[in-house]
Amino acid sequence: MNAHVRYRKKACAYLLGLALGASAALTHAEEKPPVRIGWVNWSDTEITVKLASTALQEHLKQPVKLVMADIGIQFQALANGNIDLIPMVWLPSTHKAFYDKYKDRLEDLGVLYEGRIGMAVPTSVPVAEVASVEDLNKPGIREKFDGKILTSEVGNGQYTLTVKAIEDYKLTGYKLVGSSESGMLNEMDRNLKRDKWSLVNAWSPHWMFSKWSLRYLEDPKQIFGGAEQIHAMARKGFSQEHPEVAYFFAHFSLPQADLEALMMQARESTADKAVAAYYAANKARFEGMFNPELVSRTR
């Protein structure tokens, strides 16, 4: 092989390398930036964000980045544009303080499902003795609960409302014992096994109502409000930049019975496995949550 031929082959190889490199760079440049979805380590939220993430990646080929942090940090990051949306804003009561603080920099994409919060007790606690939050002041009742109100993380919306309930109902001698979702429920489970009473901050939908027989206490002062709605909230301007994603969240729906069943399945295996199986079985329903015209433009 003479030098001229060798030179031509090397030149062709070099140019081919440049072409492939340019093609790869162009493809990389055309890739969509990820939608950053914030979430809190709550059982219902994990199912919701992972179902949404699966659907977005499947139907829109939309990369998704999940960012986990406490709810207060999520609101601040959303308002500052450091994340794009959070699908677990409980209104009108639970997250009212956070929402009121940042609402001018947020977009409400819609309601995903409904819920409820409040103080709850196992059904083994007689209704005749404790039916209402007011009954916690009856003689001898505080001692049966060891003066404890078990709650999840300190400082979240429900924790703040419970502080208000202690003040408004004048629950003298009661203290909030904050830990985590699992810590709160583990202590309640230990108490049940020892035939001890428990008073907990509960919310639904949640798998706790499937595993244990619980009931909410009446709340005549409506500190915890009535029915709650769980909203998907985005940063300002998100729906204009990502209309197809905003449309999906505006049409996202998940029956409460399905959500609670998924949470139980996640405990028995993993959330990823539960979500994958549910999504595969309900793929057609999720397809209906997208706008066909917007989807065709994004592909």
Question: At which residue positions do the language-model features occur?
Answer:
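A ligand-binding cleft/hinge motif common to bilobed small-molecule-binding domains
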Residues: P87-K101, R190-R215
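Short, well-ordered beta-strand elements
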Residues: E31-D44, Q62-V67, D146-L150, F249
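A bilobed periplasmic-binding-protein/Venus flytrap-type ligand-binding module shared by bacterial periplasmic
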Residues: I117-V127, Q229-H242
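A conserved helix-loop-strand patch within extracytoplasmic ligand-binding domains
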Residues: D104-G155
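An extracytoplasmic/periplasmic, membrane-proximal ligand-sensing/linker region
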Residues: E46, L161-K193, H206, A227-Q229, ...
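Ligand-binding cleft/hinge of the Venus flytrap
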Residues: A52-K61, D135, G140-L176, A280
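Short helix-initiation/N-cap motifs at beta->coil->alpha
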Residues: W42-S43, V64-A77, L176-E187
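Immediate post-signal peptide segment of exported/extracytoplasmic ligand-binding proteins
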Residues: T27-I37, K138-D146, R285-R299
